[in-house]
Structures are given as C-alpha cells and as structure tokens.
Swiss-Prot record:
Domain of life: Viruses
Keywords carried by this UniProt record: Early protein, Transcription, Transcription regulation
One GO term of the biological process aspect: viral genome replication
Region (Disordered): 106-133
Annotated organism of origin: Choristoneura fumiferana nuclear polyhedrosis virus
Protein name, UniProt field: Trans-activating transcriptional regulatory protein
Source species taxonomy: Viruses, Viruses incertae sedis, Naldaviricetes, Lefavirales, Baculoviridae
Length: 560
C-alpha cells in the first residue's frame, strides 16, 4: 500500500473533528442548490482514474494541508466566538442579580447583590464564587406546578367547577367542531408567529384613566402602554386626581379617580387606605394609590363597565398578534357560535370550595357538625362577668399587643375568652375543647348565624379560616343578642352584606386595616385579646372606639 494511503482513505470519509460547542449543530444541512448528481459523477471519475505513486503522494499531502488549514480556521473562529460570548454575556434586562456564594467553614451562605462596578478587586472576590444565571420572568402571576401529587380523600368539601355545558359536550366540540377547521387552516408567515409569541410573553401594562367628564358622568381614557404604571400616572395624570384606586385585570390597569368614586355615590370600604382631603390638598404633586380587590373591585368593574374595556383591549391585541388569516377564521367561528347560542357553552369555569350538600328538601335543614357541636357544648357556659377596670383601660394597648401563646385553634380561643382575665385556669369551657374546627366557607357562616340569631341568652363563638395558604380569618362571638365580628379582607365573604341579613341583632364589627398578611394574623390575635376584655366587661365599647381612632391604629370599629 502506498505511503499515507490509510490517511487518504480516512480523509475521504471523515473531515477534521467538529468542536464540541452549541454554536455547531450535530446534524448536517445541505444547501438547497447542491447537485448530488455532479458529486456522484465527480466521485466516480476520481475513483476510476489510476494514479502513479508520486501523484498519489502529492494528492495526499495536498489534502492533509487543506485539512490542517481548515482545522486552524475552525479553531480560530471558535476561540473568537467563545471570547465574544464571555465578554458580552446575557443582556442586562434578562439578568437577575448576581448570586454570591461565600464559603464560611463548612457552611454555605447565599446572598443576592447588585453589580456596583464592572470589576471587583482580588481581595473582594477571594473566597467567593459568582454564579450568573438568566432570569425567567413570569407573566403577571406566578403559578407553581407540583412535581408530585397524591390522591387524598376529602369527606366534607369539594371544589365545585361550574360550567354551562357538560364536560363531554365541551370535549366533543373541540374534537369535531373546532379541530377540523385548524387542519384546513394555513399558517401565516413567520412574522405573525413572532408577534403572537411576543404578545404572550409581554410584561407591560395597558393603562386606562377613569375620570370625570364635562359632558357625561365619567369617561375612560386610554393613557399608554408602559412598564411602570405609577410613574406614568404621577408624571402625566396627577392633575386628574392624586388619589387613585387601581383595578388590575391581568395586563390592563384602570386608574380610577377617588373623587369620581365618591361623587358617584359608591360605598368605599372603611379599610381602604387613602389619605384624607387635607393631606391630598397639601401635597398636590404626591399621588396615592390603593389597589382594590374582592367585592369593591367587583363594584368598580360593574359601575364603570371596565370588563368591556378589558375584553375589547385583550381581544383586539390578541387578534392582531395572530394575523389576518387565523383571526378571520376565529371571528367567523365565534359569530356562528353566537348565532346558534353555542358560544355560551364554552368551558368558562368558576371554582369555589363549598360543602358537598345536595339541594334537596332533606338537606335544606342540614347543619354542619361544626356548628352543631358549638351549639351543643356551649349551652351551659357563660363569659365571666366583671366591672370596668380603670387599670386595664389605661394599659389597653399594652395588654392587647403583648406577646402570648394564643393560637387559632378552637380550644385555645375558648380558653382565652372563657377564662377570667388574670386567671387562666379559671374557666367553665372544658366542654368546648371537644369542638372540632372545620375550614371556613360562606354556608358555615350563614348556618352559625341562623342557628343563633333567635337565641337571646347563649354565649359562644366560631373561628373560621378561608383560602388555604392565604389564611384569611373570621371570628364571630355571640353574647346574648350581640355579635362581635373580627375580620380583615376576605375574598369570598362580604361581612357587611352578611350583617345586613340579621337585623334582629346588634353587630360590632372590628375590621383589620393597613397591614400585610403576616401582620393581619398578628392583629387578629390582638383583637381576640381585646374581645376577651370586652366580653368580660373589663372595658367599654367607648374605650374600644377611642383606641380604634388613633392615627396609627391597625383596625377600625363600627356598630351595625
């Protein structure tokens, strides 16, 4: 065999090794204008030509030289690309702050810090590891997908999914009435696909301003598409009203004028945290924003027709991002479904956790075991009676806010309310420790109230938790014909509306305000301690009213 023949045979079928880097694809793509017939002819011609030993050696040397040159070029390009990528890194807007890992003994300490300079000194970086990773920014709302779930049995409650049409009909629609149109649909150009992808991943907000109008009761004006809503309003719309209710509907923000809401006669919840008129006038360039939710949000949406503005904005922007062809298909299909009324059987679902009770004649008089136990075990118990104590009244704030071992278990609250103040073991509520607490819902509240509203002598209470992780709490205590309510903002319960149903009784409502979730839990316990003093007559309602009127108070009181 001629010299270097083995190398020649290998070079005919394998080129220089491809660098292992993500810039180079493992698959091979051929140009569209590549003529395989010419390649085959050239290969057959080359294989049929007989060469002398010297000519073969010259060809081998030439191929090896070209292979070496190609290898050098590839390595050079790879080195330049790697260096460029190292210097450039990720874009600034996709980076999250550096994560510095400090090694201290055998423990690892992590902390996030911002980049204060382009480079760090050798001493500052000694013993530290910098880990830079891209930040995946969520859109509007974080949603966690569990890695593992288990099937659990829940006897008392289920999550009711309400749909207009049965599930099998909805599945049939998507299988036969919708998918067949998609198979005939031609995809739009790549530009339309990019627009839809950008629309879905967009994190900005469409801002609308709801304000007074000279010619009509109010008007809703589109302001701008921005990333910072409060800055946009403060810079350009502060003259409309420097007190604003913010209604957030996904990526649409409605900035509703406080003055407009008040002039329209809409009831503003007492827990809303906005400055008074005097402060707003003293600082006209300072804007105050109050995010609204739950019942008050529903009221504003309904009164100012914000659902229509949101739907039109979302629908138009979505159709624009999908392109003309697909949008036309959807519009035609939606119009047909509107005409035959099948549009309203789409899977629009609302979920609410309620007891699994059928609406039958036998179940209408149903009482939950929780309420039944409260009524049963509280028949012969009474809150301790005392006379107003000036020493307690003068130290009211100190007593209410001091730390205690109180928990939100029924037995713990019973021990607090029925134990004589200052004598923890002196109580007549041992029987109440048998009560088994249940998760809260609207039906439980109504059952408790209906079972107690006509009883003018009993003393008892109920503690309820809503929302799972959110831990929204509601406590109702009964003393004769009076009910005492302790609550913050609860998503599924409107305390004021519930109170209005039971006009035979006197209702004292303690509403927690101006606090976050953790502080709300703390202040619920504080108000339970306040309730103990009130139920045992150690303080008067006037003392509670005076305490709630303090400037830094975390709750408000009202009698209904």
């Amino acid at each position: 065999m001629p010299k270097n023949m083995a190398a020649l045979q290998q070079s005919l079928y394998t080129g220089p090794s491809t660098p292992s880097h993500t810039q180079f694809s493992r698959s091979t793509e051929f140009p569209e204008n590549l003529n395989f017939d010419v390649l085959n002819d050239s290969y057959e011609t080359f294989s049929s030509v007989s060469l002398t030993t010297a000519e073969q050696d010259n060809q081998i040397d030439k191929i090896l030289q070209e292979s070496a040159a190609m290898n050098r070029d590839v390595n050079s390009e790879l080195a330049q690309f790697t260096a460029s990528e190292y210097v450039t890194g990720f874009r600034a807007d996709t980076m999250e702050p550096e994560v510095i890992v400090e090694t201290i003994g055998d423990s690892m300490k992590r902390k996030a810090s911002e980049l204060d300079s382009d480079s760090d000194s050798g001493e500052s970086s000694k013993g530290k590891k910098r880990v830079i990773k891209p930040k995946m920014r969520q859109r509007y709302k974080k949603a966690t997908i569990q890695n593992k779930t288990s099937l659990t049995e829940e006897c008392n409650y289920n999550t009711e999914i309400c749909t207009v049409a049965p599930t099998d009909q909805i599945a049939e629609y998507f299988k036969h009435d919708f998918s067949v149109y998609l198979e005939k649909q031609k995809s739009d150009c790549q530009m339309s696909a990019n627009r839809f992808s950008d629309y879905i991943s967009e994190t900005g907000y469409y801002v609308f301003v709801v304000k007074k109008s000279e010619h009509k009761p109010f008007e809703v004006v589109f302001a701008k598409f921005v990333n910072n809503v409060t800055n946009e309003y403060t810079n350009n719309y502060y003259m409309v009203d420097n007190r604003v209710f913010v209604v957030s509907l996904n990526n649409v923000k409605f900035m509703v004028s406080y003055k407009l809401v008040r002039e329209q006669g809409i009831d503003i919840p007492p827990h809303v945290n906005l400055c008074d008129d005097a402060q707003a006038e003293r600082n006209p360039y300072d804007c105050y924003f109050e995010p609204v939710k739950n019942v008050f949000q529903t009221t504003l949406i309904n009164h100012f027709h914000l659902d229509m503005y949101y739907s039109q904005t979302t629908f138009v922007t979505l159709m624009q991002s999908m392109g003309e062809s697909k949008s036309g298909m959807l519009l035609n299909k939606l119009y047909q479904m509107f005409q035959d009324r099948s549009l309203f059987t789409l899977p629009i679902m609302l979920s609410r956790k309620e007891p699994t009770i059928e609406n039958t004649p036998l179940s209408r008089n149903y009482t939950s075991s929780y309420v039944a136990q409260i009524i049963k075990y509280s028949k012969n118990v009474r809150f301790p009676e005392n006379n107003p104590d000036n020493g307690v009244i003068s130290r009211l704030e100190e007593i209410v806010t001091q730390k205690s071992s109180l928990t939100y278990k029924y037995s713990s609250v019973a021990n607090l309310l029925f134990s004589r103040y200052g004598h923890q073991r002196d109580n007549n509520a041992d029987s109440l420790k048998k009560v088994k607490k249940e998760d809260g819902n609207r039906l439980l509240v109504e059952q408790y109230m209906s079972q107690n509203e006509n009883d003018e002598t009993s003393h008892n209470f109920i503690v309820l938790q809503f929302g799972g992780v959110n831990d929204e709490r509601l406590t109702i205590a009964k003393k004769g014909i009076e009910f005492f309510w302790i609550a913050a903002e609860i998503k599924d319960i409107n305390v004021d509306d519930l109170v209005k149903k039971y006009t035979r009784n006197v209702h004292h409502v303690f509403r927690i305000i101006n606090v976050n979730r953790r502080e709300s839990t703390t202040w619920h316990n504080n108000l339970l301690k306040l309730l103990q003093l009130l139920l045992q007559n150690l303080i008067r309602i006037d003392d509670v009213q005076q305490y709630s009127n303090k400037g830094d108070s975390k709750f408000i009181y009202k009698r209904l």
